[in-house]
């Protein structure tokens, strides 16, 4: 990876959104990075359901490839995110991929 110094005129490369609330969240780094990746996916390529809520379709195999992790590691991270209230997964059935709703942490007062 080539690097350069940051200056007032240098534009930043593409980056992932990372809510500050995740900094202290009791979950693995993999879960946090996966959340940031899914949030980016929802913001840029999300689909809208009948209620106007944005969801993504992001197969586990693709998540594993994107993060260079095993499918089992991704499944554990997804469980952490679900247990932490940061995602909701809806099964579609009939061999269709799950819908993943990426939930936004509320700001601290």
What are these regions (language model features)?
Residues 1-61:
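Short recognition helix of helix-turn-helix/winged-helix DNA-binding domains
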Residues 43-106:
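Winged helix-turn-helix DNA-binding recognition segment
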């Amino acid at each position: 990876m080539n690097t350069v110094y940051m200056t007032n005129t240098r534009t930043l490369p593409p980056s992932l959104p990372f809510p500050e609330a995740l900094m202290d969240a009791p979950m693995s780094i993999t879960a946090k990075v996966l959340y940031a990746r899914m949030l980016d996916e929802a913001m840029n390529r999300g689909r809208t359901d009948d209620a106007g809520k944005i969801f993504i379709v992001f197969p586990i195999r693709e998540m594993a490839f994107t993060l260079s992790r095993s499918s089992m590691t991704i499944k554990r991270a997804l469980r952490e995110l679900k247990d932490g209230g940061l995602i909701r997964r809806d099964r579609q059935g009939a061999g269709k991929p799950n819908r993943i709703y990426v939930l936004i942490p509320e700001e601290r007062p």
